[in-house]
A protein has these predicted regions:
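A short, solvent-exposed beta-edge/loop patch
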Residues: 6-26, 113-212
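Terminal, regulation- and interaction-focused segments at domain boundaries
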Residues: 22-34, 68, 73-78
Length: 212
C-alpha cells in the first residue's frame, strides 16, 4: 500500500472539495437561477392570454418540464395567431423541434432561420414550413438563454456549461407563434408573426435589463 505524502494531502483535498461543489449543487440542492421576470408580463398589448386549465398545465409539465408558461391569441389583418411562451430549466425540451408538440395535425416540410433586424440587434427567428397545405400553416419562434436570443441552442449550452457548473442552471424561454390561413396567405402570416416576435423580444429585453 502506497502512502500519500502529507504535502499532497491539502491540494488533493481541495481538488476533491472543488469537484463536489457541482455534484451537491445539481444533485442535492438543484440550484436554479431565474435571470429575468416572468416573460408573459411583457406581451404586446394586442395579444390576449387565456387560461387553458389544469389539463394544459399537466401537459406543459409532461412535455416541457415547465411550470411557467402562457398561451393566448391575437388577430391581425383577418388572421388569428396563437402564441405559446414557455420557460423551462430542461432546455433541450424547448429547442428540439417544439413545433412537433405545439402545432397539431401537421407535418413539417422544412425548417429555416431568418435573421431579423431589430432596434437592439439581430434576432434569429426559427421557422417551420409545412408546404402547400390547405389551410396554409406557418410556425415561428425564438429562444432566449442567459438573457440573449440564440441561433444555435446546442452551442449556447456548451458555452454556458462551465459557468452553470458552479453557479446553477438558468432557464431557456421559448417564444412561439403559429397561424393558419387560406392558401397563398403565407406572406401575410409570416409578416404578422415577425411583427409579434420583434415586439415581444423588445419588451422582454427591456424588462430584463431593468432588473440588472
Amino acid at each position: 500500500m502506497t502512502r500519500l505524502s502529507l504535502r499532497y494531502v491539502v491540494p488533493l483535498s481541495a481538488c476533491l472539495l472543488l469537484a463536489l461543489i457541482p455534484v451537491v449543487m445539481h444533485s442535492y440542492i438543484q440550484v436554479e437561477i431565474d435571470d429575468c421576470k416572468s416573460p408573459w408580463a411583457f406581451l404586446p398589448e394586442s395579444a390576449q392570454a387565456f387560461d387553458s386549465g389544469g389539463n394544459r398545465d399537466a401537459w406543459m409539465r409532461q412535455f416541457f418540464h415547465s411550470s411557467q408558461w402562457q398561451e393566448g391569441s391575437f388577430f391581425k389583418d383577418g388572421l388569428r395567431f396563437d402564441f405559446s411562451i414557455i420557460r423551462s430549466y430542461d432546455a433541450k425540451l424547448l429547442y428540439h423541434r417544439p413545433e412537433t408538440s405545439l402545432v397539431e395535425h401537421a407535418v413539417v416540410e422544412r425548417r429555416g432561420i431568418e435573421w431579423v433586424q431589430t432596434a437592439s440587434g439581430v434576432l434569429p427567428v426559427h421557422r417551420a414550413f409545412y408546404g402547400n397545405t390547405d389551410p396554409a400553416i406557418l410556425a415561428s419562434y425564438f429562444l432566449v438563454y442567459h438573457s440573449s436570443p440564440v441561433a444555435s441552442p446546442y452551442l449556447a449550452q456548451l458555452q454556458a456549461a462551465p459557468v452553470e457548473l458552479f453557479s446553477g442552471r438558468r432557464p431557456m424561454t421559448l417564444f412561439f407563434v403559429q397561424a393558419q390561413g387560406a392558401p397563398g396567405s403565407l406572406g401575410e402570416i409570416e409578416k404578422g408573426e415577425r411583427v409579434w416576435l420583434i415586439s415581444t423580444w423588445e419588451k422582454h429585453r427591456s424588462a430584463c435589463l431593468t432588473e440588472r
